[in-house]
């Protein structure tokens, strides 16, 4: 056996010796793959295929050269093939084993190469999870804008956008966010950044003329970088002024030296930069050392706006654009998760406006209204008209004549012409010299243009009335600062600035938002609003005798027992308490104007606050119930008398209303809301009248005799508060008494510019306004007080054809009413103040969608 083994070993040795002696060599396998070989130096001695950057010229590349060496320089994601790749020059992102250390991994590296689940497949984060990695004491805030992403896209096609849909499901989202008017890109982005209306921050459109600067502003002009255009304090400055750092990857205004400075980091706008590169840069900012890392970051992409303009809002192309936007969000969230920041960063995803379909068949031409279109016109969905010879003719241009010539010219017009001061107050679009005096409010899907030379009428556009559903924008939020799985009612984008300040623990600069109104979005609200403090308390107006002699010029022949009728106004304390419980169920409106002299007047069915400064009520409040009757009885005719509680020198008189004047006395509380003729006398008094243009009384009377009873039936009763507004300088705030007294129209009675009506009911319509324990519903209106009804082309039309449509155009927030009157509503509500602020900032919507 041993001999056999020795023989075998000897044979092997001989064989090897012979092989070596004959020069046999070990076989070399030719190269067949580029894995780990990309960009290697070419060698003629190498066998097999090549992977150098010239191999395509020699037609000598390995079969996987394209996938292994070329695609990584064009791709923003990993693949199984790329995992563990050798480092390649000029790749967009890396999938090499050391990419985490080098901080240049593709955002999906861990999920593709390390087997971790993707952010999209993860469950929604629990509030108890550890949120931030070491070094992040405060959650960064990312503000991400997807231009032109209308809320309806997400409503209709959410299943095609899994990343956005997950953000919606896991975080907080609004049904929609309301843009400011005009619903344009620069306008709304800068409003979001400052919390200011366009009239306040100055960017009133994408194209502007300023007579004081004698300059034109446009998106493409160099003058857009002139800081003189940009007012207010954008959020990036608020952050840096208070010790934080801010970085903006494109945002209107961020590349302008506003107030002498820029954001800590900013990028000059360049639309050619891929969305993925923008996300990658934002993630790199979050990788910076703590001393350099921004606390606030913005990110902007042009889609789906660009595609919406080209193809319209309902198209296969828009779906592709939405999916591109969705992938961009997914890339951001994957990158955040890879850094363990996905539950640390607070992210707000929103849009500036929506998108509407347009057609060249839906154009209103000014050439059809003027023989000579001798003016300058900003054409489109939000047109403005001014003199073409500026600055010379800027102030002398006949704006009123233009509006008159565009009013009620055709049986069907697809726009309404307004002087800026007459625009609906909800738009807040008057108080800036840059807002031209002539404005056209255009119907949905229509545009107003000069003449038939206009050709930009295909696809989609935006700029329309911000109440149009097509102009509504998305709002979604996610992160440790926000409530989870939370849907909230709509709100306006002026509120976002305060919200961002709260997330960053900053003190906001003055703005048009209502701080605290979005506290219900936040897990732990940073700011607690305080109740308003009344500045002027009511005085006493004691019951007194009828003045003798009575020089008021008032008469009421139907009253036979004047003393008995007047005694009805002399309520004892118990009767006053009962009246307040009935007529002021949510508390008395508080007066926030300084040095206002007024007294409370109690009647059984209504209460008013009579002002000795303006000789009329500041407000009148009453509650009406659901009635099966569809009409109210007529008021007693030719019956008006002095209120014996008001001294004659502080009272209106009937002689103030001469027949040759255009004004007539109107009633804040309708006398015929009382159940009997005798009770009507409680309201047929001078303390209940206000001056109204005769044309306006048609609207006012129909509103009260027909529409308010209708709404009371629909809502199981209403509390009604109404009163005058004085805003002669159209700044959206109440005028001083000195200003008011300059507008008395040949009488000592000042003439209001508007009247307000606030209708409050119980959201649960089982309950009446008086026994409502839950949330309230509100309809509020600010009605322009105009001498005629040309706004509705209604001088000869019956009221049922136009009044309701008119008041709906002039819907408003309760907060708008407060600012214009100096009043504070709902002071008696027991609910938390942020809930009351939600009610005050709610804007009813009546606009019907286009069929």
UniProtKB/Swiss-Prot annotation:
A motif (Cell attachment site) lies at residues 58-60. Pfam families: Endonuclease_NS (PF01223), Phosphodiest (PF01663), Somatomedin_B (PF01033). Its EC number is 3.6.1.-. AMP binds at residues 271, 309. A divalent metal cation 1 binds at residues 305, 309, 462. The keyword DNA-binding does not apply. Its cofactor is a divalent metal cation. GO terms for cellular component: extracellular region. Expressed by venom gland. Keywords: Disulfide bond, Glycoprotein, Hemostasis impairing toxin, Hydrolase, Metal-binding, Platelet aggregation inhibiting toxin, Repeat, Secreted, Signal, Toxin. PROSITE patterns: SMB_1 (PS00524), SMB_2 (PS50958). Glycans are attached at residues 39, 216, 259, 270, 405, 512, 594, 674, 745. Binds 2 divalent metal cations per subunit. Monomer cleaved in two subunits; disulfide-linked. Is synthesized as a single-chain protein and is subsequently cleaved to form a two-subunit protein held together with disulfide bonds. This is Venom phosphodiesterase 1.
């Amino acid at each position: 056996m041993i001999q056999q083994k020795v023989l075998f070993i000897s044979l092997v040795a001989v064989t090897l010796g012979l092989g070596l002696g004959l020069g046999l060599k070990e076989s070399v396998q030719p190269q067949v793959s580029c894995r780990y070989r990309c960009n290697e130096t070419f060698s003629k001695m190498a066998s097999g295929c090549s992977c150098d950057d010239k191999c395509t010229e020699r037609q000598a590349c390995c079969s996987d050269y394209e996938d292994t060496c070329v695609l990584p320089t064009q791709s923003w994601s990993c693949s199984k093939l790329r995992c563990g790749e050798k480092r390649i020059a000029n790749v967009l992102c890396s999938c090499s084993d050391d990419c985490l250390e080098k901080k240049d991994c593709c955002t999906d590296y861990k999920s593709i190469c390390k087997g971790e689940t993707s952010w999209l497949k993860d469950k929604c984060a629990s509030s108890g999870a550890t949120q931030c990695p070491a070094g992040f004491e405060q959650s960064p805030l990312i503000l991400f804008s997807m231009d032109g992403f209308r809320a309806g896209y997400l409503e209709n096609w959410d299943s095609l956008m899994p990343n956005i849909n997950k953000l919606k499901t896991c975080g907080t989202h609004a049904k929609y966010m309301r843009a400011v008017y005009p619903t344009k890109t620069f306008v709304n982005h800068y409003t979001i950044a400052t919390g200011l209306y366009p009239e306040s921050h100055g960017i009133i459109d994408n194209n502007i003329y300023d007579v004081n600067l004698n300059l034109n502003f446009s998106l493409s002009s160099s003058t857009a970088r002139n800081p003189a255009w940009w007012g207010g304090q954008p959020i990036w400055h608020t952050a840096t002024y208070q010790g934080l750092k801010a970085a903006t990857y494109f945002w209107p205004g961020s590349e302008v030296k506003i107030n002498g400075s820029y954001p800590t980091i900013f990028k000059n706008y360049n639309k050619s930069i891929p969305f993925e590169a923008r996300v990658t840069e934002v993630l790199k900012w979050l990788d910076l050392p703590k001393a350099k890392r921004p606390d606030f970051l913005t990110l902007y992409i042009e889609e789906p706006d660009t595609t919406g303009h080209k193809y319209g809002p309902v198209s296969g192309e828009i779906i592709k654009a939405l999916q591109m936007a969705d992938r961009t969000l997914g890339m951001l969230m994957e990158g955040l998760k890879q850094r363990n920041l996905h539950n640390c960063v607070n992210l707000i995803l929103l849009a500036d406006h929506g998108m509407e379909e347009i057609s060249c068949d839906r154009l209103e031409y000014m050439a059809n209204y003027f023989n000579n279109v001798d003016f300058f016109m900003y054409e489109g969905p939000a047109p403005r008209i001014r003199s073409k010879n500026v600055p010379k003719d800027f102030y002398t241009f006949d704006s009123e004549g233009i509006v008159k010539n565009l009013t009620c010219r055709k049986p069907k017009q697809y726009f309404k012409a307004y002087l800026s001061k007459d625009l609906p107050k909800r738009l807040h679009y008057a108080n800036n010299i840059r807002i031209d005096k002539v404005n056209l409010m255009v119907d949905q899907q229509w545009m107003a243009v000069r003449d038939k030379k206009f050709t930009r009428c295909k696809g989609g556009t935006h700029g329309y009335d911000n109440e149009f559903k097509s102009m509504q924008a998305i709002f979604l939020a996610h992160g440790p600062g926000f409530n989870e799985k939370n849907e909230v009612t709509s709100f306006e984008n002026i509120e976002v600035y305060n919200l961002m300040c709260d997330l960053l623990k900053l003190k906001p600069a003055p703005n048009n938002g209502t701080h605290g109104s979005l506290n219900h979005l936040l897990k732990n609200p940073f700011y607690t609003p305080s109740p308003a403090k009344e500045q002027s308390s009511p005085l006493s107006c004691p019951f007194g005798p009828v003045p003798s002699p009575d020089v008021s010029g008032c008469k009421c022949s139907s009253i036979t027992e004047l003393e008995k009728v007047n005694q009805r106004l002399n309520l004892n304390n118990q009767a006053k308490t009962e009246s307040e419980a009935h007529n002021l169920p949510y508390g008395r409106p508080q007066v926030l104007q300084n040095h206002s002299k007024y007294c409370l007047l109690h009647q059984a069915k209504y209460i008013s606050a009579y002002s000795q400064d303006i000789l009329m009520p500041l407000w009148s409040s009453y509650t009406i119930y659901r009635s099966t009757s569809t009409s109210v009885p007529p008021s007693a005719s030719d019956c008006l008398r002095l209120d014996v509680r008001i001294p004659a020198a502080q009272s209106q008189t009937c002689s103030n209303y001469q027949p040759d004047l255009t004004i007539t006395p109107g009633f804040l509380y309708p006398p015929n809301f009382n159940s009997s003729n005798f009770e009507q006398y409680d309201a047929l008094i001078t303390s209940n009248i206000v001056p109204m243009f005769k044309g306006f009384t048609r609207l006012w009377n129909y509103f009260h005799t027909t529409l308010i009873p209708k709404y009371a039936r629909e809502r199981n009763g209403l509390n009604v508060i109404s009163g005058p507004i004085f805003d002669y300088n159209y700044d959206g705030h109440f005028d001083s008494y000195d200003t008011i007294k300059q507008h008395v129209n040949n009488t000592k009675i000042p003439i209001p510019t508007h009247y307000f009506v606030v209708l409050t009911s119980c959201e649960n319509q089982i309950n009446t306004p008086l026994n409502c324990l839950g949330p309230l519903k509100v309809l509020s209106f600010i009605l322009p007080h105009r001498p005629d009804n040309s706004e509705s082309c209604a001088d000869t039309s019956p009221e049922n054809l136009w009044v309701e449509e008119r008041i709906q155009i002039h819907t408003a927030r309760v907060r708008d009413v407060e600012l214009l009157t100096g009043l504070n509503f709902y002071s008696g509500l027991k609910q938390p103040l942020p809930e009351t602020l939600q009610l005050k900032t709610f804007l009813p919507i009546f606009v019907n969608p286009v069929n």
